[in-house]
């Protein structure tokens, strides 16, 4: 993957706080470049040593949903998962940005029932399923979505379970000062080594805190997540269970036709990958002892998917699924091939 140097603002100079980015992906039409996507990517080991980088490895980004697996660590480390006998499918959903399919909704609901709660406890907000099939079926039945359809409902169900198991009132768990959320933030800080405080805190789409974090710290954290190195014993054990759960249930992590599900179904435990909003992806290559993090400057998920697939091809054996995501044929409404999106 030959990432080329490119300023995030082209000839007008660099955006404030950004070093030169790298060209990560481009869109071609008729053999000519129509659009380009720049950004930064870094691969680290568990000690934080940079193995590969393009763009600015210290570039800070809000990791968004890319760190859901790290946010799920207290669910296991606190023994909440054991207390409520959460299944591997439920643990996978706790790491997911799901499509709102019936199986996703039912699984989140089952998690809450084990804690004696229901969907009214969720504070993630409500949106229609991202699966058009699921959304149309819901509307055709005369129903409207609930918080259980939110793509983050599995993660939030895990937060509610953790609070209940600790004897806490789960109300307000999305706030930065709620004991459960403090444990979640503390886990992410411990794994990544990043300083997470009010000065770099924002509010995520599902209303929990999200913190501006250097890509290098995210990559290091995922190297640790993938290997257990430099982690407390309880987090190391939790990481293994979460990785295995997601690998065993790839349909839970996202949904049919989506990047996370297709890559996980193809590679199993060879790679852990997770997408986040605004072009952030992160993950681990456990057997190689590496973690990675990537941010596309303009937030384009299509570019992040392609660049992540190409990055995996750099470190792993060739695989048809990776190659298809790294270089995607673009078609129009008549089904004609009109161009391609490709990592560069």
Q: Which residue stretches match the model-derived regions?
A:
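Beta-lactamase-like hydrolase cores
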Residues: 2-6, 10-58
């Amino acid at each position: 993957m030959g990432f080329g140097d490119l300023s995030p603002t082209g000839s007008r100079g660099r955006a404030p706080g950004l070093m030169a980015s790298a060209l990560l992906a481009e869109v071609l039409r008729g053999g000519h470049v129509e659009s380009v996507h720049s950004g930064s990517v870094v691969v680290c080991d568990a000690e934080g040593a940079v193995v590969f980088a393009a763009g600015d490895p210290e570039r800070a980004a809000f990791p968004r949903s890319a760190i859901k697996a790290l946010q799920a660590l207290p669910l296991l480390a606190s023994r909440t998962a054991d207390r409520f006998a959460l299944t591997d499918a439920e643990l996978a959903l706790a790491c997911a940005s799901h499509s709102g399919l019936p199986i996703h909704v039912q699984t989140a609901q089952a998690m809450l029932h084990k804690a004696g709660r229901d969907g009214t406890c969720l504070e993630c907000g409500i949106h229609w399923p991202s699966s058009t099939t699921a959304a149309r079926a819901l509307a055709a039945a005369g129903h409207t979505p609930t918080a259980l359809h939110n793509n983050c409902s599995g993660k939030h169900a895990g937060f509610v379970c953790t609070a209940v198991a600790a004897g806490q009132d789960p109300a307000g768990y999305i706030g930065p000062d709620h004991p459960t959320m403090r444990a979640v933030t503390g886990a992410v800080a411990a794994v990544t080594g990043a300083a997470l405080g009010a000065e770099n805190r924002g509010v995520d789409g599902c209303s929990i805190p999200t913190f501006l974090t250097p890509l290098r710290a995210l990559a290091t954290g995922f190297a640790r997540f993938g290997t257990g190195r430099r982690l407390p014993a309880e987090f190391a054990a939790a990481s293994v269970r979460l990785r295995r759960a997601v690998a065993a249930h790839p349909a839970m992590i996202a949904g049919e036709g989506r990047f996370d599900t297709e890559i996980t179904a193809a590679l199993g435990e060879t790679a852990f990958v997770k997408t986040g909003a605004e072009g952030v992806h992160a993950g681990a290559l456990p057997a190689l002892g590496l973690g990675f993090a990537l941010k596309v400057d303009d937030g384009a998920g299509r570019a992040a998917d392609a660049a992540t697939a190409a990055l995996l091809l750099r470190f792993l054996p060739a695989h048809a699924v990776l190659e298809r995501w790294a270089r995607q044929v673009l078609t129009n409404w008549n089904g004609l091939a009109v161009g391609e999106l490709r990592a560069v």
